[in-house]
Amino acid sequence: MTNVILLVLIAVAIFVAAAFLYVSRIISIPPQGRAVDYLNSKLKNNQRVIACIGDSLTHGNIGQSWIDYLRKGFPNDVFLNEGINGNTVWQVIQRVDPILACKPDIVILMIGSNDAMGSFNEKSGLRYKRNNNLPEAPSFDKYKEQLTDLLDRLG
């Protein structure tokens, strides 16, 4: 009986490890249809470019993204998925130049959930700073300042 329990525990551990590795790999893959892809492609002149910028809420979850639904609903438009899991507004500012080079007609901005998570307390702020290579821990005041800077750049 003990051997059976041990084998079941080993099988469960292997399954959990494999599932974790699978999900980790999927969420680390950048979304399809990024600004770099657009800049390297030949598109029709009459297509509107819609830049969707943000964090994991923009990037989408495993295999699905609200941007994919927009692409299906508006097939004559180009939707850039510039959602990167875990990003803060500071990180979006650091990568906005290729997006601006696409000269988007419309920008959909969804950013701030990771800034909020990093602003809860000092421990979470330091964790976000370390894990995301931020110059400083997220804070509500920094978010307002950086969001204003980002909106100025996008405007």
Q: Which sequence ranges carry the predicted segments?
A:
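N-terminal secretory targeting modules
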Residues: 1-53, 58-62, 68-73, 77, ...
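Amphipathic coiled-coil/heptad-repeat helices and related helical stalk/stem segments
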Residues: 35-36, 63, 92, 147
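Active-site-proximal beta-strand/loop segments in catalytic clefts of secreted hydrolases
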Residues: 53-55, 82-85, 110-113
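Nucleotide phosphate-binding site architecture
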Residues: 58-59, 80, 114-117
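Solvent-exposed, acidic/flexible segments
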Residues: 59-63, 85, 89, 140-144
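Conserved catalytic-core motifs of eukaryotic protein kinase domains, centered on the activation segment
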Residues: 63-64, 120
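Alpha-helical cap/lid subdomain in secreted, periplasmic
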Residues: 72, 91-155
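A short beta-strand-loop structural module common to alpha/beta enzyme folds
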Residues: 76-90
